[in-house]
Swiss-Prot record:
Keyword annotations: Cytoplasm, Lipopolysaccharide biosynthesis, Nucleotidyltransferase, Transferase
CDD domains: CMP-KDO-Synthetase
Pfam family, one: CTP_transf_3
Pathway membership: Nucleotide-sugar biosynthesis; CMP-3-deoxy-D-manno-octulosonate biosynthesis; CMP-3-deoxy-D-manno-octulosonate from 3-deoxy-D-manno-octulosonate and CTP: step 1/1; Bacterial outer membrane biogenesis; lipopolysaccharide biosynthesis
Protein location: Cytoplasm
Entry EC number(s): 2.7.7.38
InterPro entries documented for this protein: Cytidylyl_trans, KdsB, Nucleotide-diphossugar_trans
The protein's role, per its UniProt record: Activates KDO (a required 8-carbon sugar) for incorporation into bacterial lipopolysaccharide in Gram-negative bacteria.
GO BP annotations listed: CMP-keto-3-deoxy-D-manno-octulosonic acid biosynthetic process; lipopolysaccharide biosynthetic process
HAMAP family in UniProt: KdsB (MF_00057)
Record's protein name: 3-deoxy-manno-octulosonate cytidylyltransferase
Lineage, broadest ranks: Bacteria, Pseudomonadati, Pseudomonadota, Gammaproteobacteria, Chromatiales
A single Gene Ontology CC term: cytosol
Length: 259
């Protein structure tokens, strides 16, 4: 199917400054993400940034760059400007691949695009994977999602949701809940160009500000986000220095196994 990938990238990450250009196995992390997007079969892959250092490195590797405003407070707003600059037709499917997901399987990019196409009432399509341990469930850097019976998002949170009161009570020894499946949100989104053009007009929501999760703006204003279970489980992205070292080790292992 036909879709385009836009990778928003900013240099000034608070926890890992210069994150898109940090070295992973001899190349900037952002270029690993670009390569994954290219392997997905997207008809076009471009990077949207406000930083000339990122622009220079990406262009030197033959990748299209869209320079955007330094005023954007979210990756989605950056994508919205890129879509406006490119003047894509309204029904064009745009995939937002986060610049800190260097190990994202290309098949998941295609899955998100296909999921949006098959759910015409959804404003956004995204993916999730099961959470299998307490460390992930209680990690605020890992975003959790609760879905309704049709797979549409009810809420995203950095907290463990839903709160299994009986299982998490101290008297039970904080046992793992057996009556509910927990899901981790995977950091990519599929939109139609028409929705991205409307998105900047939505006021920032208090939920979005509280959780620092821009997808909550859509839910707050009545939008619908379909969340499919990913066909394969990707490693978490890079949010911290510990994540960076973990990904470096995974890449070393992959290279060793390949040889």
């Amino acid at each position: 199917m036909s879709y385009k990938v836009i990778i928003p990238a900013r240099y000034g990450a608070s926890r890992l400054p210069g994150k898109p250009l940090l070295d992973l196995a001899g190349k900037p992390m952002l270029l690993h993400v670009v390569e994954k997007a290219q392997k997905s079969g997207a008809e076009e892959v471009l990077v949207a940034t406000d930083d000339r250092r990122i622009e220079a490195i990406v262009q030197n590797h033959g990748v299209q760059v869209c320079m955007t405003s330094v005023q954007h407070d979210s990756g989605t707003n950056r994508l919205a400007e890129a879509v406006t600059q490119k003047d894509y037709p309204d029904q064009t499917i745009i995939i937002n691949v986060q610049g800190d997901e260097p190990l994202l399987p290309p098949s998941l990019i295609t899955q998100a695009a296909e999921d949006l196409k098959t759910h015409p009432k959804a404003d956004i399509a995204t993916l999730c994977v099961p959470i299998a341990n307490r460390e992930e469930l209680f990690d605020p850097n890992i975003v959790k999602v609760v879905r309704d019976i049709q797979g549409y998002a009810l809420y995203f949170s950095r907290a463990p949701i839903p709160w299994a009161r009986e299982d998490f009570a101290a008297k039970t020894g904080n046992r793992w809940p057996t009556s509910w499946s927990y899901y981790r949100h995977v950091g990519l989104y599929a939109y139609r160009a028409s929705f991205l053009r409307r998105y900047p007009q939505l006021p920032v929501s208090p939920l979005e500000q509280a959780e620092c999760l821009e997808q909550l703006r859509v839910l707050y204003h009545g939008g619908r986000i379909h969340v499919a279970i990913a066909g394969t489980i990707p490693p978490p992205g890079v949010d911290t220095l510990a994540d960076l070292e973990r990904v470096r080790q995974l890449l070393v292992t992959q290279e060793r196994n390949h040889n």
